[in-house]
Every structure is written in structure tokens, then in C-alpha cells.
């Protein structure tokens, strides 16, 4: 695990002070000594360069998607209502409660159970009968991370592969190298008893000479490399593809060039090819892309139960500067019982400063930001889940999708604002939504400067919720706070 250090321009003295305390931050038991001001050593021997970090942390959709895959330990029981729009509304709508009802090949059923699946998830109940239907049906599906979406389309690919035919028959596009590998691992695990079915990766670094005879039946890759393999190197004959999967469509269109490359690949597929598209969200741009690339689809949408603030008590504390904010935070910590807490900062510099202050005062703290690799983030979140650190300080990279049951308090050390310096309502909602999870009650504290009070009032009006002022010096008032 890397130990991170960020350089600021707050002056050499403060920088030196921060450097001295930051080396054992992420894993306190690992005292990484001798850190230079310009570089930070990782445990694996590599080095992180320090950069200016007064900017807001940018949320990377692909990285967050991979992170959610890495930290899921089991299927999530979705709180969404599944809505199915059939291509032919008059045809009967089937769902299944067991995998046996799907009449799968014995080796596939063994693979599913070996992976730990006991019964289909809510999404799988509706999607699998469509994906495995004869003749094949196209599908556009919305699915949150952790609901078994990848397993569902992998099952569809493995079901339609003819192991005796030694050429690519199933093609899956993913937006990144890492996400492609994650999908491939699911193929390899589910297909472990399908002895004659193999997977190949069309990803950067996997250089295959032009004219090579590709004999593996399932190809998983990124759009650019797949396009090169199909049209330039002639490694894949798209007219022989039986199943085409486009995964993470919302991430795909967020990456320059991938949308056009994906459409070019899809247009070379035969009309009888089954086409499946998955996306976590369905903004207008994603929906327009999906309709362009998937002809005559069935559609599965999720009607999300609204994130509610009703079970979260919200407070604000007026402060003069960040030291006042920290003192108020200490007073709150001294007055109420806290399980685990997530503290959000707008910039990496503030996150680093706050982390060092809390470490100096003996708190068990970990720091999460966009500068860490996805594996490092996953490790930090797992440690936080395991209770090894009680406080997670983060930027917006952790604002959504990460559920830790023990979190009882969320602190906005900085209010979330957009580039126009207006309140970022959606980020606020997802930040404080990290507490009050799973039907439990939670607390949210906003540390704000006086000139930011109008922004907070806009947030209060927007959500039609009450945000009460708290006097951080009144310990009696703090001690009366209840969940």
C-alpha cells in the first residue's frame, strides 16, 4: 500500500511539518522513514511524484466502477424496483427464482454454484430468461454494481458458445483494461467446467501479429484495440459473432472516441447476433447511445427508491477558518458516541491537512483520494470496513456507491460546490447518504465559513429539509444530540 504525500504552497515550514507526520498514514504500523520532499516511496518500491493539489478531486467513472467491483464481497440486494419494457408487449413475461429453471448445461450450473451464487438476484430473475431465449433477444439493461450483472451476461455468452468451433463467437467491450480483466475473470470462473471454451483479451499490450489464427471463442477488450483487431489486423471476423456485449455504457461514452469505435464495431455484426448493453445510469446521452447501437431491444430499467434525508439529522457549525472547523470537530467528537465517520473535503490539500491534525491527536485515520490506484483505494476501504481505522477522510471520489454499515456520522469539512461556486446538490445528497444507510439513522455535520451560509441555505431549501445550527462550544447541546 502506498503512503501518499501531497505538496502544497502553504509554505516550507508547514510542508515540512506535514511530511514528517504523513509517512505512516495509510498503514500506521508501517513506518516509512526517510521521505524526501519530492517523492514518496510505495511499499512495492515504486515512487509517487508530488504534484500541486489545490484542485478539486475529479471523479473517474471507470475507476469508481472498478473499485465497486473490487470491494463487493457478495451480491447486493437491490432496493430498486425492476421495470421491464418488452420489444413485443403481447409476449409473456418470464422470470425465474432458481438457476435450474433456466435449463442450463450441467457444466454451467456447476460453474455458477462454484462461484457462490445460490439463487438469481432481482435483476437476474428478469434478465436471464430474455438473455437465454431462443431465438436470441437483444437487451438494454440498467444495473447497479453488485447485482450480478456481469455474471448474467457471461452466462449468456457461455450458453451460446459452440466449443467445437475454434474462432471468436462472443465479443464483449469494456471501457478500460482493468474492467476487461475483471470480466474475463468472471468468464474463467464460471466457465471452469467448460473445458474447451477459452477467453482472449483484446487489450493494450497483448500484441498479436497480423494473420494470426485466433482460436479462442470469447474475446473481451477495449473498443480501440478490438477495432484494430477486427479491421486492421483481421484477427476477428465480426460476421461470425453470435453475442455482442457492451458493458459500462455510461463510462464508455464518457471516454473520448469510444462511442464512435463501438458503433463502428456493432455495424459490422450480423443481424442474427444477440446484442446486450449495460449501464449503471441512463441519462439522455446514454439512452441515445443505447438506442443507436442496440436494435429492437427489450429494456430493463430500475426505478430507484429516492435517496431520502428523512433519517439523517443535519447540523451546521459556523467557523472562521479551517482551524476553527477542526476545533469544532474535536468538540463534537468529545460530546457524542461515534461508530465510524467519513469526512469530506473539497481539495486534496485540505484532506491532507486534516488527516495530519487528527493523527497528531491520536485518531485512527485513513485517507482516500483520486491520486491512489484503484487497488490502493479498495484496500483502504476494506480496512475501514474492518474497523482498523475509525475515520475515513476523502474527497469526492468516495461520495457515492460505497456502503459501510458502521458509518454513523458524515462531516462536510467543506461544502460541495460546482465550478460556478454554486451548491452541488447531487454530491451533497450522496455525501451525507453515506450515513443513514440500511434503514438506520445518521448524523451529518456541515463545517462552514460565514460567507458560505447562503450556499447552505440553498441546499436546505432545495431538499426542503431542516439543517440546524450547532454551537460547538456548548457541550451540553452537543451531548443532547441523538441519532
Swiss-Prot record:
Domain of life the protein comes from: Eukaryota
Motif DEAD box: chain residues: 247-250
Post-translational modification: Phosphorylated on threonine residues. The phosphorylated form is found in the cytoplasm but not in the nucleus.
Ranges for domain Helicase C-terminal: 311-478
An annotated GO cellular component: nucleus
EC numbers on record: 3.6.4.13
Chief localisation class: cytoplasm
Motif Nuclear export signal boundaries: 61-74
Protein name: ATP-dependent RNA helicase DDX25
Name of the gene: DDX25
